[in-house]
Amino acid sequence: MGTIRLMHAKLHRVRVSEANVDYVGSITIDRELIERVGILPLEEVDVVNLSNGKRFSTYVFPGHTGEICPNGGAALLCQPGDILIIYAYEQRPRQEVLEKGHFAKVLVADAENRCQQFFEQSLIPRGDGRGVEFSSQEC
């Protein structure tokens, strides 16, 4: 039946604190934020800039409290104050998702990149092995 790529973590509405074109690449993200949603250092992420519509993929470095810093080429796509959504995905066997479900952790940030809201989005198996129900619950 194959595999399916599902979101497992999302940082919603984080703000760029700085952009460093001279750094080696990546995006530096507040360590507490990535740990809260389960993103690992060096994990690939997709980034959507809500302030200008640009999108890019990169990898994560852990940073200091409040830090959201696109580095290298990604720094050319953002400027301080821009609002971003950062997604991380995992590849799962489709049948396993239908049988056991899936959940993703979502953190909504305030203007200082602190957790404003935290919740889980889940796929819950229907029991017939062919479908799932979607659920979203605040933690």
Swiss-Prot record:
Pfam name, any one: Asp_decarbox
Amino acids binding substrate: 58, 72-74
Isomerase keyword on record: no
UniProt cross-references to InterPro entries, sorted A to Z: Asp_de-COase-like_dom_sf, Asp_decarbox
EC number: 4.1.1.11
Tagged with keyword Magnesium: no
GO molecular function: aspartate 1-decarboxylase activity
Pathway note: Cofactor biosynthesis; (R)-pantothenate biosynthesis; beta-alanine from L-aspartate: step 1/1
Top-level taxon: Bacteria
In-chain residues carrying the UniProt-annotated modification Pyruvic acid (Ser): 26
Locations listed in the record: Cytoplasm
UniProt subunit comment: Heterooctamer of four alpha and four beta subunits.
HAMAP family (alphabetical): PanD
Protein's name according to its UniProt entry: Aspartate 1-decarboxylase
